[in-house]
């Protein structure tokens, strides 16, 4: 499970150090792809394969399934962390997420998300009130 917030930096080659506590889970490979709200999703290869199976079972006759699958898979990039724990973020994905030097990596249960630092700060500030309001709707009777 991926938890927490980290602030790695992109180097001039578009590489970033993955947080050390996640490296074992990602050592076998990972997939980086477009996420919602202009962030990037980082999946361990097994989780990406599970999602692939779910999408494979969805009806290709449904336009929404075709549209989502095209964007999701066309932007996906298989990556393997180097010996130092760095992963390269492809230029097209850096551009999509507006990534420059300062980034934020958040744990989001089964995936990591990579955000531009300012975009994340803005999103988090905007969502703080919504977070409080949605607790009962999202987790009824739990919290």
From Swiss-Prot:
The SpoVT-AbrB domain, residue ranges = 5-47, 76-119
List all membrane-crossing ranges: none
Task: State the Gene Ontology terms under molecular function.
Answer: DNA-binding transcription factor activity; transcription cis-regulatory region binding
Q: Which PROSITE patterns match?
A: SPOVT_ABRB
Q: Which UniProt keywords apply?
A: Cytoplasm, DNA-binding, Repeat, Transcription, Transcription regulation
The GO annotation for biological process reads: negative regulation of DNA-templated transcription initiation
Where the protein is mainly located, per its record?
cytoplasm
Family that this chain belongs to? Belongs to the MraZ family.
Any idea what this protein is called?
Transcriptional regulator MraZ
Q: Which organism is it from?
A: Thermobifida fusca (strain YX)
């Amino acid at each position: 499970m991926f938890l927490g917030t980290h602030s790695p930096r992109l180097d001039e080659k578009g590489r970033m150090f993955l947080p050390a506590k996640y490296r074992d889970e990602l050592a076998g490979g990972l997939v980086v792809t477009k996420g919602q709200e202009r962030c990037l999703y980082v999946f361990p290869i097994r989780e990406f394969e599970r999602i692939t199976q779910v999408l494979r079972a969805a009806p290709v006759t449904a336009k929404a399934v075709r549209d989502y699958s095209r964007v999701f898979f066309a932007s996906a990039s298989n990556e393997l962390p180097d010996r130092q724990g760095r992963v390269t973020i492809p230029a097209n994905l850096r551009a999509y997420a507006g990534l420059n030097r300062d980034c934020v990596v958040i744990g989001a249960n089964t995936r990591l998300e990579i955000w531009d630092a300012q975009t994340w700060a803005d999103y988090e500030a905007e969502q703080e009130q919504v977070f409080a309001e949605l607790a009962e709707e999202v987790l009824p009777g739990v919290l």
